[in-house]
């Protein structure tokens, strides 16, 4: 994937269809399956944020152009008006001359509703994490700490170990406390669980930390 930072509010990136398939997505389903296309978009935006420090805040203006061998995507963040009272989308001059099918306020309202829905989905997803380890010894060290209450699955992918953690039925405080322990031995990864399931190697399907402790941490 190629990323180009246009300015403070705009970033452009190009993804070949090979890039898309390498991430575990089918080139056809991204057009017809909204859930999967959004999953791909936010996975890519996480990488854009890491590489370009492009934080996604507020409504977005998104242009997608289908090319012969991939997609070119331009993402622009809405900006506050000079009086600080209204969000404005920096639409290019050539687009402003085209007949608008919707009033800008209505368009922004739709963006805000979409953003609220995304935020709610992200809040729910924050009960699940993918963690990357430097080596297997770090996984063993973590298993000795008796981190309980979460569901854990271990994968290997591209010579790294990844632990999928599901903090189901845990309070925000419990999640925060356990995550702080986990992050002493691992780093949070932007790789999705779907990509690990598709391209990674499943090592331990459930109770991963308990199993590792039983066999390696005696």
Curated annotation (Swiss-Prot):
Keywords: Competence, Sporulation. The keyword Heme does not apply. It comes from the Bacteria. One of its GO terms (molecular function) is protein-macromolecule adaptor activity. Pfam families: MecA (PF05389). InterPro entries: MecA_C_sf (IPR038471), Neg-reg_MecA (IPR008681). One of its GO terms (biological process) is negative regulation of sporulation resulting in formation of a cellular spore. NCBIfam families: PRK02315.1-5 (NF002644). The N-terminal domain has binding sites for ComK and ComS and probably for unfolded/aggregated proteins; the C-terminal domain interacts with ClpC. Enables the recognition and targeting of unfolded and aggregated proteins to the ClpC protease or to other proteins involved in proteolysis. Acts negatively in the development of competence by binding ComK and recruiting it to the ClpCP protease. When overexpressed, inhibits sporulation. Also involved in Spx degradation by ClpC. Homodimer. Belongs to the MecA family. This is Adapter protein MecA 1. The gene is mecA.
């Amino acid at each position: 994937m190629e990323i180009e930072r246009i300015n403070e509010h705009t970033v452009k990136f190009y993804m070949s269809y090979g890039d898309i398939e390498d991430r575990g997505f089918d080139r056809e389903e991204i057009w017809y399956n909204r859930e999967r296309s959004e999953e791909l978009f936010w996975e890519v935006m996480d990488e854009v944020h890491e590489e370009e420090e492009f934080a996604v805040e507020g409504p977005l203006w998104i242009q997608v152009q289908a090319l012969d061998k991939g997609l070119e995507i331009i993402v622009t963040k809405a900006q506050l008006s000079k009086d600080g009272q209204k969000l404005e989308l920096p639409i290019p001059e050539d687009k402003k001359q085209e007949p608008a099918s919707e009033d800008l306020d209505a368009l922004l309202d739709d963006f805000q509703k979409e953003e609220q829905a995304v935020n709610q989905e992200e809040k729910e997803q924050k009960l699940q994490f993918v963690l990357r380890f430097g080596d297997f010894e770090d996984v063993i060290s973590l298993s000795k700490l008796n981190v309980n209450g979460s569901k854990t699955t271990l994968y290997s992918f591209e010579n790294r170990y990844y632990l999928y953690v599901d903090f189901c039925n845990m309070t925000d405080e419990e999640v925060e406390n356990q995550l702080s322990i986990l992050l002493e031995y691992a780093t949070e990864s932007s790789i999705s669980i779907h990509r690990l399931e598709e391209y990674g190697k499943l090592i331990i399907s459930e109770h991963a930390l308990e199993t590792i402790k039983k066999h390696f941490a005696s």
